[in-house]
Amino acid sequence: MILAAGFGTRLFPLTIDRTKPAIPFLGKPLVGYVAEYVAKYGFTEVVVNLHHQPDSVIEALGDGSNFGVRIDYALEEPNILGTAGALDNAKHLLQDEPFLIVNGKIITDINIGALVEAHRLSGALATMVLKPNVKREKFTIVNTKDGCVTGFGPHAKPFTEEEIRDTTGSLESPLMFTGIHILDPRVFEYIPPGIFSDIVTDIYRPALTNGEKIAAHVADGNWFELSTIPRYLDISLAMMNDRDVWLGENCSISPASSVRDSVIWDDVVVADDVNLYRTIIADGVRIEAGEHYENAAIVRADMVRNCTEIPEKALKGYIQGENYIVPLN
């Protein structure tokens, strides 16, 4: 199952007209990479949950055939149900055998080829794929012992100045959850039907208290989570293979302008004497002659004007002419 129902509030305004997994990432919808990833390891029957802007996910994935999978959609109405409630909503599609869950907002090459068999042999309620949080980003710490999850801590804290100066190489990286896990159908015994519930807070924590085994699979490999605009830009630039600009379809960029380290979506027009550096330019935006932007995301202003509510977690922006500008620093 691919989780694709979230609001994407921290990616606003890029998610005004689509859910987070449906945003384009280097020429393909983000959730398309996830579909191809699970197909690579033989998971070809896929359930995708929907809530916010559901049509954007359906448009991105279709029936799944372009990505090597066959998709059943599970719509959550009228309310979003969370990472555990989503499973209950799709129980009729998942309850017959152990199933894989992958967050729809990640890019990864973690090898999960042997994970299903390892899970079967473990007898665990679930097997969580974990990864060292080398940069100590703001993810929940997962505590483990002897290959099992023992509990969940607070968010990891950034390195202190003293730790940064440490040259002994003795600093430990806490483990974090990658959003990839395999669950036994017994998990449905723990999920309250029909209401919002979170898989870690409402299911895994009580299950551990009840003596259930949750296996920990610590993985190598690349893993990127694109839940904020700065992270989306940084990861895009890192994966562009030395390209200076990612250009979408039907774009017109004046040769008299400078565009560097930027991600340009579809139908964008850049007039003369424009300077863009580290920018994300969304669909249909026109950058007028002489404008200069650095470290910014830009969408059409009319999209924001027609938006009933700007999410509290969204970065603050401002309207300039026909565009809505969101500074990223």
Question: Which residues does each predicted region cover?
Answer:
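N-terminal glycine-rich phosphate-binding loop and ensuing alpha1 helix
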Residues: 1-58
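Glycine-rich "substrate-gating" loop/helix at the edge of Rossmann-like oxidoreductase active sites
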Residues: 20, 76-81, 220-225
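Catalytic-core segments of class I nucleotidyltransferases/pyrophosphorylases
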Residues: 98-102, 107, 113-120, 131-136, ...
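Structural signal for interior beta-strand "rungs" in well-ordered beta-sheet cores
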Residues: 241, 245-329
